[in-house]
A protein has these predicted regions:
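Contiguous, often N-terminal, cationic amphipathic patches that form binding interfaces
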Residues: 1-74, 82-84, 88-94, 99-120
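The alpha-helix within a helix-turn-helix
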Residues: 77
Length: 120
């Protein structure tokens, strides 16, 4: 059975690559858009709970020159069953507020699968 995917509609003030979502995640074709609230320098690297329109993700890497974001992308690549090249940081490379585009994820972490199921 095919997965039903909704297209997020960018609003006027968003750039060509930036999407506004009703929740922390949504589909644009086969690409998953994910709004993230990152926590660098954490004790454990984990996908946390939603906080507003962002998903909390903690990483152990320090917040120096985008290292925490790079580490987060590597971690999420494993969680979604994709390569790091399949994940694009739309904005927030050097900030805790990020938007990621994950092309054709092969698996979904439970918190994301639950949110997407509720959107359908």
């Amino acid at each position: 059975m095919a997965v039903k995917r909704h297209t997020a509609k960018p609003e006027a003030e968003t750039s060509a690559n930036e999407s506004k979502l009703a929740s922390f995640c949504g589909w644009e074709g086969d690409t998953l858009i994910l709004n993230v609230l990152g926590t660098p320098g954490a004790k454990k690297t984990v996908i946390g709970k939603p906080k507003g329109n962002q998903l909390k993700i903690s990483v152990t890497a320090s917040p120096e020159n985008g290292k925490a974001t790079d580490y987060m992308v590597k971690f999420l690549a494993g969680e979604f069953g994709v390569t790091t090249k399949d994940i694009t940081v739309v904005f927030g490379q050097f900030n805790i507020h990020k938007q990621l585009r994950i092309k054709a994820p092969k698996k979904l972490p439970s918190v994301i699968a639950k949110q997407l199921a509720e959107q359908n």
